[in-house]
Amino acid sequence: ADLAYLNEEYLSKFTKTGKVDSVIPVQPAYAKTKEVEAYYPVDAGEDCTAKTYHELSIVVGNATDIKTTMALRLLEGVLLESESSPLRRALLNAGVGQNISGSYVGSLLQPIFSIKASGSEPELRDKFISVIYKTLQDITINGLDKKLLEAALNSTEFKMRESDFGAYPKGLIYGIGVMDNWLYDGNPIEGLRYNIILKELRDGLKTRYYEQLIENYLLDNTHKVIVSLLPQPGKEEADRALEVEKMAKLKA
């Protein structure tokens, strides 16, 4: 009845224009890694020591490739999220930052794998990048610790099978899992069919599957950006003065 009312009173008065184009275009890969340097405001006279941020962000794969998405999420945790993580440990030992972290955003059409250093200095950017590449290259040659991978996979499998999502309702998490694929014209049900994928990921522990992912997506892939965020005393005041000047011109 409600739908009929909406149609009779509103929708029927409009002409159907055809199919809505909701396709999100894929961003072409960069020919080479981009570099960005930006500034954030700190108080005038403030000590800027160890207040620089460096980040390497990499576009990796496609959200509709659920197996690869899950595998890269596992890799991010293994490489960066624990005291035993080899990439995190290498960056801390190299002194490129006081804090090292990572993130993996798999809900975008083109997921993003990020490696971050905070509490750093501007001149440490090149060292930050070189340590990342050297460590990842060493891992692809010598192999990733399969015990770390297996532990991460066991934890993921437990959460999925037991619907253990902490304080979050399982229905909400299932809905998000469905939408991550459905939003980009993938099969929504595939986001819930994890048994086969978990088996394939576990089989990958016996091969170079994870090392190959590192090679293909993190090393040989040029769709990357290096971002350095530096402190700039007095920037807030300068930006405010420019905004006041801009508004004055608009009012004139």
Give the positions of each predicted feature.
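Edge strands and adjacent loops of beta-rich recognition modules
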Residues: 41-47
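Charge-rich, well-structured scaffold segments of protease-associated domains
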Residues: 1-32, 47-65, 71, 77-252
